[in-house]
Amino acid sequence: MELVLLILVASLIGIAFLALQQHYSYWRRMGVREIRPKWIVGNLMGLLNMRMSPAEFISQLYNHPDAENEPFVGIHVFHKPALLLRDPEMVRNILVKDFAGFSNRYSSSDPKGDPLGSQNIFFLKNPAWKEVRLKLSPFFTGNRLKQMFPLIEEVGASLDAHLRQQPLHNERMRCFDLEAKELCALYTTDVIATVAYGVSANSFTDPKCEFRRHGRSVFEFNLLRAAEFTLVFFLPHLVPFVRFKVVPAEATRFLRKTINYVMSEREKSGQKRNDLIDILIEFRRSTQLAKASGIKDQFVFEGDILVAQAVLFFTAGFESSSSTMAFAMYELAKDTDVQQRLREEIKDALVESGGQVTLKMIESLEFMQMILLEVLRMYPPLPFLDRECTSGRDYSLAPFHKKFVVPKGMPVYIPCYALHMDPQYFPQPRKFLPERFSPENRKLHTPYTYMPFGLGPHGCIGERFGYLQAKVGLVNLLRNHMITTSERTPHRMQLDPKAIITQAKGGIHLRLVRDALGV
């Protein structure tokens, strides 16, 4: 009996071994160059052991010797075969030219357990994504941004006042130290609160206010949160079973209550502010009218689908811009010549505008734009993009591969950070060189190698808004202060291995010196 049991166990182990060997030989059988995976974890060991940031992990795959000179390479995300793109023309095909066959992200959250995370425009799948994107687009037109500008600058002026009120740590040097990311997050939180919701968060006077506290909770990465986001992007089918929420439960309750209250009060008063709340109210009215008229098959804009868009605008809006501003402060602190040139540009523009920060004045800052473009090359908010093949038939990769076709459901990853740091596209990639993005040099860039906000129809809908609030914030910061390094400033930036988005490990500690431009 024991011998029979032993033979049975050995047989089962042997069958499992052969099955795994067959499974993980997928790319060899398809005739596709692969990066050899490890069983169970696939090619994700570098991410799972948290010895490197997601940006560095994706670069390691991109630069792997087995991927050299290949337009794409086969990888495994845990058990599942996936494609990692390396050729800019393939990036164009997947993100733009053949978007219809890759219109969904592979990543997703749990529709039941995480309604505000799963139903926002970032995670929504077609056709719901297309409907929501179409409805939200008017909020980000040039005319809308023009209407928003006074509200953004009002918060910018509060940032300037907040900094001028800070006690000096050294009277002789007229300076004080701070953590740049937190300062910038206070600013962007207040901007989003007033521009999107029509409320004052007052983060500068109360850094622990509910808006800031709940915003922080979404992007505060510990070991558990890191593991959960890894599932969202690489093993999304397991997310419902682990009950992970992109938007934590407490933040969900606060934001749902706040947004529904603001919408209700706005409808009662009839007031119009041309903000996101007005757009969401119009969404709801269109659904109500359609129901009253007996119109069927119209996408339903009500309940959490409305709140989810407001939540995404809040969380993504404050996080990406505050990170960009903080990384810009870090690079400016290390490069005094670039900072001096920028401050001179700001001073000249302020003189031209009579000392007022206006939309025209902000739009005239060409060197500021070059700096932000270079910062976003070095520190893109998301280090990679993900797509899922949604084509009704297998997608051919010709002329890049004559035989292999991408099956429906296969994940595809675009390594933004790795492309940004590839010396064949951006020489001396680790060096901060805003001149890369001068109007003349931009024309020389290889298309589809720069994508800090994504590309194609799925590109970030709030990109122009993000640039605008970052520029207003930096102008008000540099108007009366110069940025320098301190004893706590790292010589080389280290990215947080726990954060799926691009964040500095341990914060960005800098020093501000009182030095008014005199305008």
Swiss-Prot record:
- Give a Gene Ontology cellular component term annotated to this protein: endoplasmic reticulum membrane
Q: What is its EC number?
A: 1.14.-.-
Q: Where in the cell is it found?
A: Endoplasmic reticulum membrane; Microsome membrane
Keywords, in A-Z order: Endoplasmic reticulum, Heme, Iron, Membrane, Metal-binding, Microsome, Monooxygenase, Oxidoreductase
- Name the Gene Ontology biological process terms: insecticide catabolic process; response to DDT; response to insecticide
Membrane-topology descriptor: Peripheral membrane protein
Task: Keyword check for Heme, yes or no.
Answer: yes
InterPro entries, alphabetically?
Cyt_P450, Cyt_P450_CS, Cyt_P450_E_grp-IV, Cyt_P450_sf, Insect_CytP450_Detox
Instruction: Write down the PROSITE patterns for this protein, in alphabetical order.
Output: CYTOCHROME_P450
The organism's place on the tree of life at top rank = Eukaryota
Does the record carry Oxidoreductase as a key word? Answer: yes
Specify where it is mainly localized. Answer: endoplasmic reticulum
Q: Where does heme bind?
A: 460
Q: Which cofactor does it need?
A: heme
GO MF term list: farnesoate epoxidase activity; heme binding; iron ion binding; methyl farnesoate epoxidase activity
As for what it does, the entry says: May be involved in the metabolism of insect hormones and in the breakdown of synthetic insecticides.
Membership in a protein family: Belongs to the cytochrome P450 family.
What more the UniProt record tells us is:
More highly expressed in DDT-susceptible strains (Canton-S and 91-C) as compared to the DDT-resistant strains (91-R and Wisconsin).
What name does the UniProt record give this protein?
Probable cytochrome P450 6g2
